[in-house]
């Protein structure tokens, strides 16, 4: 299917036959999902030929060589949930002036801190298809984390990718196309870390739904079918090698290529093995094949073992509530079950990531994520310690950041329908408007309910740890109403979507009836209008569809504004001839109502494009697994690479709106497109250079008595320490049951041609030239590739040359080149 010539971006779609990397660890061929093979040891960091990373490792190793075992463990270990000022806090090494590391939610704002901006979500940002704006947004977000004294942002999100329309957290990501999200991942990594903050790419990998991310026993009994959550383990996402490389791993590869310093592993299993202790995922795919040099941290409570996870490539346990690390990790090193050089590498990766990203916060965080109180006990959760200043109420907002947030929201608005040039509005077209719907007005619970799980009115974000704390929020009713006043247009707002008599009375005499509708998705944190993160269905909330039908039956100029995390069912009203215009957006942040007004009244020309496909039949979307009758739930990704537009293309399914669709208030034409291959593609990739020599760390003191709780030291409740309690209990363990394939022998060079550099091996190339008549063409490549060689694309625009690079796999057989072009307004 070809995309219609509406809009903003030009797409060059290059797809290929996928090939298995035969030198990688292989699972059985009996089942394409089967189980994860093992890969050991964890590749030692700092051995790849990258000057900036090597310099960071050089400095970090100097520090680690001076540390005791307990000091190293302290860096790898969270101190417990809510046991510090940030979302997550590690221990410190005061002797070497190394402070506790502060890691903080979330992707779009400094969650649980005051006086910050709440930016549009990732899905809204990706709708802009504007690389400069995406970079600027990342810089702005990074600057606010820096201003609050956080060391690392727990974001952005590249998993879930949003392959499931009803998935709860798809809005935190950037859509199911791997190239689009990959471009964004690269830009956001550079932007955030330019501010001296660690970027944490999450969630690795296959975390495409919220149901069953944890093992649960009747958690919601009495509210919904208890069997829905009656499981003994978390969901296993079973993904084949081609889909892993061409879809799900791709954005993480681009983040690594951009120098990302931290990656968070996910709650779910991958092919039968928990993601945070999956040696094939962490040791091979991430640290060997992609050459990741930073550190891997767990999602909160995603760890199910200590020694196995550390040997599998995990570097930091957050928040370490179950204490798999802490004193247990110290014990594992002392009794010989965890090699000391693995602990050395864990600590070094953490420190080198901070150095690489330019983190320098000598005063620490100036806020406390547990409370907005100005003063209180230093250990607020335990209510212990001295009375100290908890929140300095530092205002990190700026005119520049607000402008970026506003611009990102404007360019995230997608115009889906505009019959008879209904929009933009103006006094010459309308004298009276009605603003209708519960989703247009204030939420009766405000904007600060727990983890933003409000959902009873207008919304600026989804809910969960990926939300933000609003300093202000403009509802559609306020924004559109204020703009109508400027135009001297009479308006009325009716917020009751259930008793519709007042709304219909208002609409009957209006020149335009504007119905605002939404659905709210988020993290599985509890009941939000009967939804537990993932959406129960793709129907608009708050009785919106009956209201639209009733209003449009009496007003032939009905305008519908839809806000949702991802796709939503538009079929009940989209073909209604009295519904003359439809606007869509994902969650737009603090300026939601202001942005809608700007677009409705023509102050801004809508330029957003859909970062996913909207189906005609909701049954064509990949479903969320909602109920299981087995204790160990499995999600087989049988669609493989055929997600979103790939699926609709392959199976010739009808769609309502294509990936990349979006109208504007202008008309354009395109002519004389020419594609030339100037250089044949070579399938012979050159291997990357061998790794530098393995670093030999100084051995720490192995006397258990050195690591007991210091005499007179008072331990806080619910706080994790690196100490052991009984030195006499430490005995050498020569019978530990290591996994199959376990080894401590480091490789001299890349395991396969796919490995050897940041984001993969970049050694072979192809040149394609596009000659375009129009000077204002934006080109975006969407390439279904494995991760290895270099592909150079040169774009000629009126004699101006723009070159960009991308990676591919050895033996990349190109089977088709499809040019899909859109004009930039």
Swiss-Prot record:
Residues 1-20 form the signal peptide. Glycans are attached at residues 21, 74, 97, 230, 271, 328, 335, 537, 550, 556, 578, 667, 690, 718, 733, 761. Its EC number is 3.2.1.21. InterPro entries: Cellulose_deg_GH3, Glyco_hydro_3_AS, Glyco_hydro_3_C, Glyco_hydro_3_C_sf, Glyco_hydro_3_N, Glyco_hydro_3_N_sf, Glycoside_hydrolase_SF. It comes from the Eukaryota. The active site is at 299. Pathway: Glycan metabolism; cellulose degradation. It is an enzyme of class 3 (hydrolase). It catalyses: Hydrolysis of terminal, non-reducing beta-D-glucosyl residues with release of beta-D-glucose. PROSITE patterns: GLYCOSYL_HYDROL_F3. Belongs to the glycosyl hydrolase 3 family. Homotetramer. This is Beta-glucosidase.
């Amino acid at each position: 299917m070809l995309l219609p010539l509406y809009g903003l971006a030009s797409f060059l779609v290059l797809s290929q036959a996928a090939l298995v990397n035969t030198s990688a660890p292989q699972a059985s061929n009996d089942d394409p999902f089967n189980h994860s093979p093992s890969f050991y040891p964890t590749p030692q960091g700092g051995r790849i030929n990258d000057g900036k990373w090597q310099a960071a490792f050089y400095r970090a190793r100097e520090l680690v060589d001076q540390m005791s075992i307990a000091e190293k463990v302290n860096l790898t270990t969270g101190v417990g949930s809510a046991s510090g000022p940030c979302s997550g806090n590690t221990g410190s090494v005061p002797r070497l002036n190394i402070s506790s590391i502060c890691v903080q939610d979330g992707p779009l704002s400094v969650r649980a801190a005051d006086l910050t901006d709440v930016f549009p979500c990732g899905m809204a940002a990706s709708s802009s298809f504007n690389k400069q704006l995406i970079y600027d947004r990342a810089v702005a977000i990074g600057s606010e984390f820096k201003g609050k004294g956080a060391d690392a942002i727990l974001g952005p999100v590249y998993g879930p990718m949003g392959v499931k329309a009803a998935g709860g957290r798809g809005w935190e990501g950037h859509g199911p196309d791997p190239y689009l999200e990959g471009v964004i991942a690269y830009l956001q990594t550079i932007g955030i870390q330019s501010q001296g903050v660690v970027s944490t790419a999450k969630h690795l990998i296959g975390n495409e739904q919220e149901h069953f991310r944890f093992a649960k026993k009747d958690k919601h009994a009495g509210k919904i079918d208890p069997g829905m959550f009656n499981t003994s383990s978390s969901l296993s996402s079973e993904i084949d090698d081609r889909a892993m490389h061409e879809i799900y791993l791709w954005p993480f590869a681009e983040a690594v290529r951009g120098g990302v310093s931290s990656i968070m592993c996910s709650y779910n299993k991958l092919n039968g093995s928990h993601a945070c202790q999956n040696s094939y995922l962490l040791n091979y795919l991430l640290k060997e094949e992609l050459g990741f040099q930073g550190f891997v941290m767990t999602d909160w409570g995603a760890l199910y073992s200590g020694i196995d996870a550390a040997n599998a490539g995990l570097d930091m346990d957050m928040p370490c509530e179950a204490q798999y690390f802490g004193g247990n990790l110290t014990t594992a090193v002392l009794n010989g079950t965890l090699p000391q050089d693995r602990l050395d590498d864990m600590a070094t990766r953490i420190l080198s990531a901070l150095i690489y990203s330019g983190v320098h916060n000598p005063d620490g965080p100036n806020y406390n994520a547990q409370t907005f109180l100005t003063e209180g006990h230093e250990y607020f959760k335990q209510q212990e310690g001295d009375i100290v200043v908890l929140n300095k109420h530092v205002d990190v907002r700026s005119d520049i950041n607000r402008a970026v947030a506003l611009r990102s929201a404007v360019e995230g608005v997608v115009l889906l329908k505009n019959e008879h040039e209904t929009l933009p509005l103006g006094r010459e077209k309308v004298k009276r408007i009605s603003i209708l719907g519960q989703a247009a007005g204030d939420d009766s619970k405000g904007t600060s309910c727990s983890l933003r799980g409000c959902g009873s009115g207008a919304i600026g974000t989804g809910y969960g740890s990926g939300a933000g704390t609003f300093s202000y929020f403009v509802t559609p009713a306020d924004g559109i109403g204020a703009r109508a006043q400027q135009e001297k247009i009479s308006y009325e707002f009716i917020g009751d979507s259930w008793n519709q008599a007042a709304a219909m009375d208002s609409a009957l005499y209006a020149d335009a009836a504007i119905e605002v509708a939404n659905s709210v998705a988020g993290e599985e944190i509890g009941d939000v209008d009967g939804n537990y993160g993932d959406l129960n269905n793709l129907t608009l909330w708050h009785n919106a569809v009956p209201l639209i039908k009733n209003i449009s039956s009496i007003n032939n100029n009905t305008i519908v504004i839809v806000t949702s995390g991802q796709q939503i069912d538009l079929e009940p009203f989209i073909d209604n001839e009295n519904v003359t215009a439809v606007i869509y957006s994902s969650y737009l942040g603090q300026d939601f109502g202001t942005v809608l007004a700007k677009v409705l009244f023509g102050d801004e020309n809508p330029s957003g494009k859909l970062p996913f496909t909207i189906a005609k039949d909701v049954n064509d979307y990949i479903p969320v697994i909602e109920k299981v009758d087995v204790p160990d739930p499995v999600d087989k990704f049988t669609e493989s690479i055929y997600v979103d537009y790939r699926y609709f293309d392959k199976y010739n399914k009808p769609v309502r709106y294509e990936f990349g669709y979006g109208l504007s208030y202008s008309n354009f034409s395109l002519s004389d497109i020419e594609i030339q291959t100037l250089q044949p593609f070579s399938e012979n990739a050159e291997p990357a250079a061998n790794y530098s020599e393995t670093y030999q760390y100084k051995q720490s003191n192995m006397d258990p008595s050195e690591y007991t709780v210091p005499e007179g030291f008072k331990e806080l409740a619910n706080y994790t320490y690196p100490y052991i309690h009984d030195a006499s209990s430490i005995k050498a363990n020569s019978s530990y049951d290591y996994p199959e394939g376990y080894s401590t022998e480091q490789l001299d060079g890349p395991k396969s041609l796919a490995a050897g550099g940041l984001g993969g091996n970049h050694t072979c190339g192809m040149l394609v030239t596009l000659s375009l008549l129009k000077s204002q063409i934006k080109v975006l490549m969407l390439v279904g590739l494995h991760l290895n060689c270099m592909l150079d694309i040169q774009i000629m625009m009126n004699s101006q040359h723009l070159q960009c690079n991308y990676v591919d796999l050895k033996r990349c057989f190109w089977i088709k080149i499809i040019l899909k072009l859109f004009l930039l307004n």
